[in-house]
């Protein structure tokens, strides 16, 4: 199944193999949205992709502060892993009709990718 938070390397073991990163946006221990994401990642793996799960409960991201855009620790892991992915699967519970605060915070951290070339998650599926 998908590897979890840890190493940020993108290079696939097999040339031509896609790397799919799943971003799980629930802080709940028994998360239904994370369970659905794990099923989707398993399907991607069965189709030949290398997969990685970024579980926001385990990642424990600090709040994004736009005045301090140099990520370290968990934030750097999130940013580098997402940028290196060939494709992403996102899953979040809905609270008050929108994504969880933890999920939104993770997307805020990806703002840092705007200064890269190509910017953000451009050309990712």
Sequence positions of predicted segments:
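Basic/polar N-terminal segments that are highly enriched at the extreme N-terminus
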Residues: 1-17
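Helix-loop-strand module that forms the ligand-binding subsite of alpha/beta enzymes
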Residues: 3, 71-125
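Short beta-strand segments at enzyme active-site cores
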Residues: 52-55, 90-92
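Short, glycine/charged-enriched secondary-structure capping and boundary segments
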Residues: 35-38, 66-69, 103-107
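Short secondary-structure boundary/capping segments
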Residues: 12, 43, 53, 79-80, ...
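N-terminal beta-loop-helix "entrance" segment that forms/cooperates
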Residues: 53-73
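N-terminal beta1-alpha1 ligand-phosphate binding loop
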Residues: 12-49
């Amino acid at each position: 199944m998908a590897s979890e938070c840890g190493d940020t390397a993108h290079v696939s073991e097999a040339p031509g193999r896609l790397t799919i990163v799943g971003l799980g946006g629930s802080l709940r221990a028994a998360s239904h949205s994370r369970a659905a994401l794990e099923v989707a990642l398993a399907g991607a793996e069965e189709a030949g992709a290398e997969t990685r799960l970024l579980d926001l409960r385990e990642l424990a991201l600090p709040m994004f502060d736009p005045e301090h855009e140099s990520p370290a620790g968990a934030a750097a892991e999130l940013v580098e892993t997402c940028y290196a992915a060939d494709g992403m699967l996102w899953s979040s519970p809905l609270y008050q009709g929108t994504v969880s605060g933890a999920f939104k915070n993770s997307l805020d951290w990806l703002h840092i990718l705007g200064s890269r070339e190509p910017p953000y998650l451009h050309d990712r599926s």
